[in-house]
Amino acid sequence: MTLWLGIDPGADGTGIALIRLTPVPVLLDHDVILNDTSEVGTVYIARVLGAIDRIRCGHFDATNDSGRPRMAVEAVNSPTGFAAGKRHPIDPAHLLGCAIVLGAVLAAYPDSVLVPPGGNGHGAYASYPPELVTAGERRRADWATRPAGQSTTIRHARSAFDVARQGPSCARRARLAHLTRQEPLL
C-alpha cells in the first residue's frame, strides 16, 4: 500500500490530499487551509505545516516509520502575462505568496517530489472522489463530464489530489534524470 500526500501551495489557500495508490486512487484525508489575511506570514505557514503534519502522521506508525506517505508538491511556474491565451495581469504578491508556501513546505520536507503545475484540479468532476465535488457542482445534468471549475474552496484539495496522483511518475522521472545525468570527471 503506497500513500502519497499531495500539496497545492497557494497564497490564498493551500490544498492537501492524502491518497492510497491503487488502480483507482482512494482519498484517505484532505484539507484546505485558507489564508485569513492578505499576506503570507508565519501564522499561515504554521497552519499549513501543522495541517500537513496532522494528515501525514495520522496515517502511519511514527514509532517505526512504516508506511510513511511520500510527498508531492506542485511547483510554481515563471509568470508569462497570459492566461487562457489572453493577456492577463500578474499579481506579484500572489506569486510571491505561492513561492513562500512552496519554500516552507520544501524546507520542512526536503525529500518531497516536485510536480509541474498546469491542469491540476481541472479534470472531469467524475475523476475526483465524491468528497471533492460539491453539491452545487453536481446540479447540472452533465456535471460528471464537465471539467472542474475554480469557483469553490475545495478546488485546492482537487489540485492536491491530482498532485498526489502524479507524484510517483514525477519521482521516477527525477530518478531517471539523476541516473542518466553525466557528472564531470575530476
For every predicted segment, state its role.
Residues M1-L186:
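Phosphate- and other anionic-substrate recognition elements at nucleic-acid/protein interfaces
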